Amino acid sequence: MTTLMVQGTTSDAGKSTLVTALCRWLTRQGVKVVPFKPQNMALNSAVTADGGEIGRAQAVQAQACFLQPHTDMNPVLLKPNSDTGAQVIIHGRAVTTMNAVAYHGYKEIAMQAVLESHRRLGESYPVIMVEGAGSPAEINLRANDIANMGFAEAVDCPVLLIADINRGGVFAHLVGTLELLSPSEQARVKGFIINRFRGDIALLQPGLDWLEARTGKPVVGVLPYVMDLHLEAEDGLDQRQTDKVEHVLNVVVPVLPRISNHTDFDPLRLHPQVNLQFIGPGQAIPPADLIILPGSKSVRSDLNYLRNSGWDTAIERHLRYGGKLMGICGGLQMLGEQVHDPLGLEGAAGSSAGFGLLAMSTVLEAEKQLRNVRGRLTLEDAEVSGYEIHAGVTTGPALEQAAVQLDDGRCDGAQSVDGQVLGTYLHGLFESPAACSALLRWAGLANVQSVDYHALRERDIERLADLVEKHLDGPLLRELCGLEAN
């Protein structure tokens, strides 16, 4: 078994995308490869085949390998629920919530989980493609590191260092990061990859020559800037819009302080007939055909934020003039009458009033519901698939008019009697073409075009593998993976 790790000079340098590309590139050559990220901090997560929870980036990387996501692919997941604290998920299950200082002392236990998962994957896969987190040169985080060089040292693996030239300062990033590493860590870095380059490569060549001479390490390749990739953002909210022939349906989503699984909206962002707007703090709330309340890692505090920002008044006005309102997961809970957190799972214990638009209440419980599900929307009987990740148990008469009839016999979500308000616990439902079309028609869009989001993502994974084939040093990459040259 061989392990190759990709680390970045910064967050968003391109680590997730490169690992996805390398996974598909190797898979196309018949190599049995598996993705791995020791520790991930993200609010976007996916449900695995073994009923756990991992970062969504690793789920996409699994798709690149034609594998089902598994908890061993991301053994430690941290989901922030305040500015200083996070829920700690080990092997797909939430085990505790702690602040950053407490977690620092917990890292030894977390590292055991990381190495256990790495060992298990190594028993089934000859190549493990690893993604680091943030930067390996964060001085304040280097002690007891499990996400970058601490892991690489523990399993004795080579490292590729990637940097984003589009931000500027790429040579300072690469050389500075390298020089902040220990001698043994520096020796692990086997080469550099420059990401998101625009322009004539000949103009960059003197810098590449200098970098190789300065460090004694090769530039494995320069990847071009790629427009319109349909891969899910690991954490940061992707507010890019694709070109629209015509803005037909206006959809507005509030950017909550603790928004989670905002990848739910990627299919809408890419839909040619949808104008999707994320509205952040201080921004005017525009007119809309559909308002969607997203998932939240801290429902009660985000409810308070919405009220303080005037969303309660805006929603009331929106409904009065015939607009449609939808809530997903935490957004569903907000639509009800009360949200109770007796255990203090998302902050101080207590209760908060919801918007009172659906006759139901939610109690947050310690045991999370984690499921991949299939079913049919009660709107148009449209097929839908998605996943549940929630600690809330919702009850009340509103649930008698369900939003989804699940194949396992359960019902999900609720609709208002007048048909203006709909809520569901299902993440990812817009990825189902039939369900997305039905919901857009419900929101008022006529002549809806069907968009296959899964096909778009698969196409772009192939595009990424093509870029690796064209722009990176294939023989060196195969050597680092313990493979013979083609």
From Swiss-Prot:
Transmembrane segments: none
PROSITE patterns reported for this sequence: GATASE_COBBQ
Active site: C329 (nucleophile), H427
Pathway connected to this protein: Cofactor biosynthesis; adenosylcobalamin biosynthesis
Segments forming domain GATase cobBQ-type: 248-435
Keywords (A to Z) from UniProt: Cobalamin biosynthesis, Glutamine amidotransferase
GO annotation terms (biological process): cobalamin biosynthetic process
Molecular function terms from GO: ABC-type vitamin B12 transporter activity; catalytic activity
Cross-referenced NCBIfam families: cobQ (TIGR00313), PRK00784.1 (NF001989)
Record-linked HAMAP family: CobQ
Known role: Catalyzes amidations at positions B, D, E, and G on adenosylcobyrinic A,C-diamide. NH(2) groups are provided by glutamine, and one molecule of ATP is hydrogenolyzed for each amidation.
Similarity section: Belongs to the CobB/CobQ family. CobQ subfamily.
Name of protein: Cobyric acid synthase
Taxonomy of the source species: Bacteria, Pseudomonadati, Pseudomonadota, Gammaproteobacteria, Pseudomonadales
GN (gene name): cobQ
